[in-house]
Amino acid sequence: MGKNNDWLNFEHLVKDKQIEALKPPSMYKVILNNDDYTPMEFVIDVLQKFFSYDIERATQLMLNVHYQGKAICGVFTAEVAETKVAHVNQYARENEHPLLCTLEKA
């Protein structure tokens, strides 16, 4: 007579008795790029509004954008980075500024 408890054996559900480890998500840098037309005050506003920087840090990053051509605003998962880029670019266009926010793999 067979075992009545065979249905309790879950080993067949685990491939080779190994549990796959979860990989950390891919991360992306959100970057503000310099242009010759967007006012510095607007860049500071963007950094405070979308990245929650205080005035000192926002000013420092704005100066990096101005003098170095770009600055990393933060590193995020793909979905968060894409959303931030879209929101910043939309906000810039709504305010008629050519400010460009991009992302690249970290």
Swiss-Prot record:
The Gene Ontology biological process terms listed for this entry are: protein catabolic process; proteolysis
What SUPFAM superfamilies does this protein's entry cite? ClpS-like
Look up and give the organism this protein is from.
Yersinia enterocolitica serotype O:8 / biotype 1B (strain NCTC 13174 / 8081)
Say what the protein does: Involved in the modulation of the specificity of the ClpAP-mediated ATP-dependent protein degradation.
At the top level, the lineage of the source is Bacteria
Please name the PANTHER family in this protein's record: ATP-DEPENDENT CLP PROTEASE ADAPTER PROTEIN CLPS, ATP-DEPENDENT CLP PROTEASE ADAPTER PROTEIN CLPS1, CHLOROPLASTIC
Give the protein family: Belongs to the ClpS family.
Q: What is this protein called?
A: ATP-dependent Clp protease adapter protein ClpS
Q: How does it assemble?
A: Binds to the N-terminal domain of the chaperone ClpA.
> What phylogenetic lineage does the species belong to?
Bacteria, Pseudomonadati, Pseudomonadota, Gammaproteobacteria, Enterobacterales
